[in-house]
Amino acid sequence: MAPERRSRLSDAGILVSLLALTSLVPVQAAVTTSKPDYAKRAERVLRSTPLIDGHNDLPFAIRRSTHDQIYDGKVPFETALKGQTDLPRMRKGRMGGQFWSVYVGCPSDPNTPIDFPTFATRDTLEQIDVARRLVDKYSKDLMYCDNPACAKKAFREGKIGSFIGIEGGHQVGSSIAALRQAFYAGARYMTLTHNCDNAWATAASTVRAGKPDLGMTEFGPALIKEMNRLGMLVDLSHVSHQTMRDVLKVTKAPVIFSHSSAYAVSKHLRNVPDDVLKTVAKNNGVVMVTFVRSFVNIDNPDSVTVDDIVKHIFHIAEVAGWDHVGLGGDYDGTTELPKGLEDVSKYPYLIEKVLEHGATEEQARKLIGENILRVWTEVEKIGKRIQNSGALPVEEVWQGRNWTQSLTKRSTFIPTESPTQLEFGCD
């Protein structure tokens, strides 16, 4: 009887073991099926917060292709354009706001004097005009905004907020007065330089060409003072590293980088070094990551994918914090775009990747729009506070500027000593 008893006990043990094993199967299946749905999470983020891109060159693309003519079917924005941006793709990309860049190139000769005769200011105003006319034409989908409250309103109404930025100080002739008029015309940020120096600052391209990084000029602080007074965003993309540092020492308001990435990840001078990222955090500013392949990976640009963009985003978030990173693709300003981010319709995929790499939904909301809206709101508040204090517009002019021949010698029309001695000089 004893052997039979042992056999029954063994059978019972096997049965218990089998039951235990089978009980694990549903648990394992549950683990497998609970994989996060990043697309659904990205959709939740995009539904709650406007995705605002810091830099898109569509106005320049229009200028180049149609000389600013948008009517009579010349620019079929509502159906399909050949570039990287049009209304259907913006909608597919779940875009909530766009800073439209108005861009006029620097002189082709790098030795051109700063105060060169130019039509750049005229051309800039014409691009502001075409950007605003495009928004008006498609007002069912786009809303022109010159303040962050309007940007939020546009999103609530299901429209794409449309804002304007100037891509280079040479476009206002190195003139604070001209900059002020561009602000009144609707521009809400100005990039201090493009790929040329001006009366205010040194450009990154100058340093790349082997010349010294002189940073901001003596005239530069006057510009920053006026931009702070106006409530205009100071954009430090394109400037040299020393210019970044110099501006951050004098500005009273947060700054933006409308389309730059992390220098520690890719040693391109258009990117932002870590010491500057830390200062941007103290300044409460934002660095909006660009997608230009040669900036993202200077050593192997052809290999760049969406994962490389995510790497820049996470580096900036690690050094400066999630409150200080945003997005500035540079669509229609480059042909160098990563696999997976070929046009503006691909933004949801980027947000999925950011979440997949470990960002929370709260962090993703900051990235796509909350940060730039916070910065813009603070810049606007600081401007109003400065104006309410009685601060007058800055009148300072660059000492190296050329005056027309009739103005090279000051008239005594405004008397400094004797009110009886007036010289009109225009008879």
Swiss-Prot record:
Belongs to the metallo-dependent hydrolases superfamily. Peptidase M19 family. Residues 1-29 form the signal peptide. Hydrolyzes a wide range of dipeptides. This is Putative dipeptidase MCYG_02918. Disulfide bonds join C106-C196. It comes from Arthroderma otae (strain ATCC MYA-4605 / CBS 113480) (Microsporum canis). The lineage of its organism: Eukaryota, Fungi, Dikarya, Ascomycota, Pezizomycotina. CDD domains: rDP_like. GO terms for molecular function: metal ion binding; metallodipeptidase activity. Glycans are attached at N402. Zn(2+) 2 binds at E167, H238, H259. Substrate binds at H194, R270, D330.
